[in-house]
């Protein structure tokens, strides 16, 4: 199972051909538009066709004739052809909206939407970059639900920034266990999680592009699960109490008897983890933190040049409401962007995540998702320590359209020892469409390592479609 959302762009988005506006000024934070953000569409009031021209006529009755309103298709094309123009000096909030039908084997068919707005707190200030707000949602046939909002307020010629975001997630997913070996073995237990998340941060410039700030967050995760009963079922087959079935179950029985290539005792990794650690399925975590960052990027959500470095330390004390424990978390992000030839950018990303103490089961560092190690189910590989790196080549090919290709690698360790042989790879390609000024909608397809080929459900190479707004990093 791979937790990703594949979204197919609507044909209306692909019909546009307006030139992108110039880049915005540097903003002082790594926080992109939410990594899961894209689209449902709302067309504003109809306007006369932009190519329509009024000429003076001798017949005065012609002057009184009503102007023909453009059709729906023409209005959609006109709307998106103007959507990447910076209108933040004209409007209080420059809203855009777009649809996102999607499909994934993990979550089924779905409808997603993105409502995104750019605005300036002072419309007479051309130095400070625009602030932004976004609301994203996705609903699928397999009952996956995601609702998320974020807002970034930029002040005082980019010297201060206040950011906050929240999300609600209902996800019928899977748990593979903790540690590299657990992820490699591929035993997954169905696990339905309900998550509520809130984040807030504030940073200010000390010297030039060097910023320091404070942060806070609240996480709640509730889990529902049940045992597969596979140990008892296999034993009944072995004791001839029931006949051996055909299909996948029969194959699993043969694998169990043939050299223990299948172990039914590992079929319920979440139940085993809870029993072994005494952890609680439902966990509440709050944190306070400090961070420092250096940022020379030209645009935060679609950089073409510059450097971004951020170190953050978070503390989760038990007295602040954390479930039965106190632990710390440390993250490091390093991004570098270099213009190559016309329309080409080489982007590099390095990310490290480590915990001190023992976190709740859902707070371990997780590999995979929509930004790093694309192609892996997020959380299949999780542990106390994680490191990931990737190179991505981005090439604009025609006006607002572009393509990318990337290659990367990563590791998790802590429960298991660090070994170079445990390194996982990620590679893929994608399409880009400039939806708003310097903001891309991206459609990626990523691949990873093969799963456990002994298991009938895990023999293919890990892969995933991804669709969201803004670049991965």
Task: Give the positions of each predicted feature.
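Transmembrane beta-barrel strands of outer-membrane/channel proteins
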Residues: 101, 113-115, 133-139, 149, ...
């Amino acid at each position: 199972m791979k937790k990703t959302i594949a979204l197919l762009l609507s044909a209306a988005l692909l019909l546009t051909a307006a030139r992108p506006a110039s880049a915005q000024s540097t903003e002082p934070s790594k926080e992109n538009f939410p990594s899961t953000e894209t689209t449902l569409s709302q067309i504003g009031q109809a306007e006369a066709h932009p190519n329509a021209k009024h000429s003076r006529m001798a017949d005065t009755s012609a002057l009184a004739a009503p102007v023909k309103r453009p059709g729906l298709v023409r209005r959609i094309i006109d709307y998106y052809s103007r959507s990447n123009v910076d209108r933040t000096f004209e409007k209080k909030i420059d809203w855009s909206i777009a649809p996102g039908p999607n499909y994934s084997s993990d979550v089924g068919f779905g409808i997603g939407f993105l409502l995104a707005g750019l605005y300036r707190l002072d419309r007479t200030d051309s130095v400070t970059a625009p602030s932004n707000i976004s609301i994203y949602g996705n609903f699928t046939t397999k009952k996956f639900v995601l609702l998320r909002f974020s807002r970034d307020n930029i002040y005082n010629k980019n010297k201060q920034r206040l950011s906050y975001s929240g999300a609600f997630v209902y996800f019928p997913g899977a748990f593979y266990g903790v540690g590299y070996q657990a992820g490699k073995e591929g035993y997954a237990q169905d696990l339905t999680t309900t998550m509520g998340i809130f984040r807030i941060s504030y940073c200010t410039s000390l010297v030039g592009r060097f910023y320091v700030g404070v942060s806070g967050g609240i996480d709640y995760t509730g889990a529902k699960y049940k045992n597969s009963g596979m140990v008892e079922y296999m034993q009944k087959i072995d004791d001839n109490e029931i006949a051996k079935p055909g299909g996948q179950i029969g194959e699993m029985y043969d694998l169990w008897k043939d050299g223990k290539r299948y172990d039914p005792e590992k079929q319920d990794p979440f139940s085993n983890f809870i029993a072994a650690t005494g952890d609680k399925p439902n966990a509440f975590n709050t944190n306070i933190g400090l961070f420092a960052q250096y940022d020379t990027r030209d645009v935060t959500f679609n950089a073409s040049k510059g450097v971004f470095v951020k170190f953050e330390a978070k503390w989760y004390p038990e007295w602040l409401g954390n479930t039965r424990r106190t632990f710390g978390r440390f993250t490091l992000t390093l991004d570098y962007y270099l213009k190559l030839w016309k329309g080409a950018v080489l982007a590099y990303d390095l990310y490290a995540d480590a915990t001190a103490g023992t976190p709740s089961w859902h707070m371990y560092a997780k590999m995979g998702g929509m930004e790093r190690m694309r192609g892996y189910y997020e959380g299949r590989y999780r542990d106390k320590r994680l490191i990931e790196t990737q190179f991505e080549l981005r090439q604009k090919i025609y006006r607002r359209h572009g393509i990318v290709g990337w290659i990367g690698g990563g590791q998790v360790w802590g429960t298991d020892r660090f070994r170079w042989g445990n390194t996982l790879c990620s590679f893929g390609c994608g399409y880009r469409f400039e939806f708003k000024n310097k903001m891309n909608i991206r459609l990626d397809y990523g691949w990873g390592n093969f799963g456990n080929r002994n298991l009938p459900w895990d023999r293919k190479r890990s892969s995933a479609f991804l669709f969201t707004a803004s670049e991965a990093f």
